[in-house]
């Protein structure tokens, strides 16, 4: 949150405009990825919300900025947090504004266990065929609370595709439509996996 000094839009010299300050903060955040983090480290910093004001002729008193970061390393996560607050503080100080900075550490990286991942892949190949299963996918920057379970017990997190055709698109897209034809494939996968693990030979 950036706290300035609101006032009439026709008299900006009497205000400390948090909108102007906020845009400079957002712009400066992007330099963290390109100039402060090792380019060999995958990292995403996305600003997704900017809220402030409710009248066209009034400069608001404050704005709220929200977003998320994604990376695979706790060290990089801490680096992002520290640098984001430094940038926020320095820009706000330069313009005479105050700020409130909050950084929530939500989910760690989801890292599959080797044996469980291999088993998951074999079961999927048995059901759908080898050409339909990607055993070495590009790491995703998406987050998943299943990561906490993998920190405690060995396991594997998999994706079951939605297929092609109408409604086939990435998650969080308003055009998404679940493909019911994939239900038997998903159900068969879980049955096969459970039977294999619970069989007498295993």
Where do the model's predicted regions map?
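Fold-level recognition of mixed alpha/beta catalytic cores in primary-metabolism enzymes, strongest
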Residues: 1-27
